[in-house]
């Protein structure tokens, strides 16, 4: 079967609404790509998106009158004269394969690789985390996840407990376990994240060393030598009393999900209790790390 595709440039705030509307008017599949043409796998219901510009790509049956689709998008205010869009005829393809072809093994730091489960690992002697992008955030394609993975790779985790606050797919907790941590604890507000983390941990053979909690069920007085939290700057500041209490004496803290422009305000919130390292930036994002004083 042949298809026709419309690709339009949008913003993180509008992408979801446009996607809903495209499905309403007959699109059989809507996907998002970021500015690097990397598929965005991680949307969570109601979550603020962490990326900047988003391209919305909608697939329609080849018989669809695409000029009518453009008219409807304009009528609804989803397309104006400043919005770039492109319509393309697409030959029959294995869509799933095409999507899978876009997700490649990625290296973080010296030892760590994140590999889609359907690909061969590039280095069997490396620390390989096998991951299938699911509904929960965290494949390593986002700069904030990458910054946290690189930080974990650089730590000596042997025998340590690691808390992954806002675990999403569980990628950071699982990477920590594979990098030598004794145990990891994943916490998230989203039940989907708990499920995804459990599945991914099982796939990586570390489920017996990963405890998972919904935020509301998190035990009191939990502490770890290493705490990593890749959520947004706002919640990181609000959660300062909670997150800082999770870190054991002289323990390490890694924070991301922070725009570079927000680094100063997050540092201000944490510097009373932590000796902070230099902020590391990647694209418009950054990572803040430090040690409990
Ligand atoms: C940006 S994702 C990070 C996922 C993964 N740790 C990574 O680095 O790719 C943020 C995650 O934090 C969770 N989250 C957001 N606010 C939270 C909160 N207040 N408490 C716990 N989890 C939260 C979201 O549900 C989401 O799964």
Curated annotation (Swiss-Prot):
One of its GO terms (cellular component) is cytosol. It holds the Pfam family PrmA. InterPro entries: Ribosomal_L11_MeTrfase_PrmA (IPR050078), Ribosomal_PrmA_MeTrfase (IPR004498), SAM-dependent_MTases_sf (IPR029063). One of its GO terms (molecular function) is protein-lysine N-methyltransferase activity. The keyword Lipid metabolism does not apply. It catalyses: L-lysyl-[protein] + 3 S-adenosyl-L-methionine = N(6),N(6),N(6)-trimethyl-L-lysyl-[protein] + 3 S-adenosyl-L-homocysteine + 3 H(+). Keywords: Cytoplasm, Methyltransferase, S-adenosyl-L-methionine, Transferase. Transmembrane segments: none annotated. S-adenosyl-L-methionine binds at residues 145, 166, 188, 230. It is an enzyme of class 2 (transferase). GO terms for biological process: methylation. It is found in: Cytoplasm. Its EC number is 2.1.1.-. Methylates ribosomal protein L11. NCBIfam families: prmA. Belongs to the methyltransferase superfamily. PrmA family. PANTHER family: ELECTRON TRANSFER FLAVOPROTEIN BETA SUBUNIT LYSINE METHYLTRANSFERASE. This is Ribosomal protein L11 methyltransferase. It comes from Mannheimia succiniciproducens (strain KCTC 0769BP / MBEL55E). The lineage of its organism: Bacteria, Pseudomonadati, Pseudomonadota, Gammaproteobacteria, Pasteurellales.
